Amino acid sequence: MGVFTFQDEYTSTIAPAKLYKALVTDADIIIPKAVETIQSVEIVEGNGGPGTIKKLTFIEGGESKYVLHKIEAIDEANLGYNYSIVGGVGLPDTIEKISFETKLVEGANGGSIGKVTIKIETKGDAQPNEEEGKAAKARGDAFFKAIESYLSAHPDYN
């Protein structure tokens, strides 16, 4: 098994606490409203804390698909949230698990900087596919921007 680590950063005009609330605390409600392709977010196991598994159902290529998302850690005081993709179409056959360690910090002009570390654990001696990595980054960028756009369009959300 190999572990491959990547880091990325997103900037937003939304304040860190407000963005965190939308991305973590109210995610099950906000994400399907903000991200056009996501139909639903539902808890399939757990109570919403670490260890909880959520099913995100979305439309891709005209078909309904899903990913299983496991909450690894929630750190409200430091605006941190760690989760893993543990099943569904978001996990190619060569990948054991994809983990995301996220943290929001204060950005310019009251906005946010989202810092994310992505760890891909492969099965056997498989190597991550570069195209899959680029596609995953593009989905992450689009997701983050969709949440930011939703919050900008709904300034009363807090």
Curated annotation (Swiss-Prot):
It is found in: Cytoplasm, Cytosol. It is an enzyme of class 3 (hydrolase). Transmembrane segments: none annotated. Trans-zeatin 1 binds at residues 8, 83. Melatonin binds at residue 83. Ca(2+) binds at residues 32, 35, 38. Its EC number is 3.1.27.-. The keyword Cell inner membrane does not apply. Trans-zeatin 2 binds at residue 60. Trans-zeatin 3 binds at residues 69, 81. It comes from the Eukaryota. Keywords: Allergen, Calcium, Cytoplasm, Hydrolase, Metal-binding, Nuclease, Pathogenesis-related protein, Plant defense. InterPro entries: Bet_v_I/MLP (IPR000916), Bet_v_I_allergen (IPR024949), Plant_def-hormone_signal (IPR050279), START-like_dom_sf (IPR023393). One of its GO terms (biological process) is abscisic acid-activated signaling pathway. GO terms for molecular function: abscisic acid binding; calcium ion binding; cytokinin binding; melatonin binding; protein phosphatase inhibitor activity; RNA nuclease activity; signaling receptor activity. Its main location: cytoplasm. It holds the Pfam family Bet_v_1. GO terms for cellular component: cytosol; nucleus. Belongs to the BetVI family. Class II ribonuclease (RNase). Binds to several cytokinins including natural adenine-type (e.g. trans-zeatin and kinetin) and artificial urea-type (e.g. N,N'-diphenylurea and N-phenyl-N'-(2-chloro-4-pyridyl)urea) hormones. Interacts with melatonin. This is Class 10 plant pathogenesis-related protein 2B. It comes from Lupinus luteus. The gene is PR10.2B.
